Amino acid sequence: MARRTLEEIYENIGPVSAFVRQLRKQLGYTQEQLAERCGVGIRFLKELELGKTTLRFDKVNQVLAYFGFQLGPIKMERQPLDE
């Protein structure tokens, strides 16, 4: 399997779970290694990569910050809700 460049990964950012998993694998880290480097528990990282929807934003940002990213608002292609 050919390794993807970081640029290719960035161009195809999908769910945060897939994004983190792809970057971790690109660096050749195990989940345990990345969790330790980011200062989060292995259980949290596993849940993040599995797409659990009830994770703490601060901890997700702690992992994303390791790669130079953070969560933030993204404009969606739909009509805004009534004010």
Segments and roles (model prediction):
Residues 1-15, 75-83:
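N-terminal flexible/basic segments that precede or flank functional cores
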Residues 18-33, 37, 62:
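Short basic helix-loop element that most often maps to the first helix and adjoining turn
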Residues 12, 19, 44-47:
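Residue-level recognition of specific faces of alpha-helices
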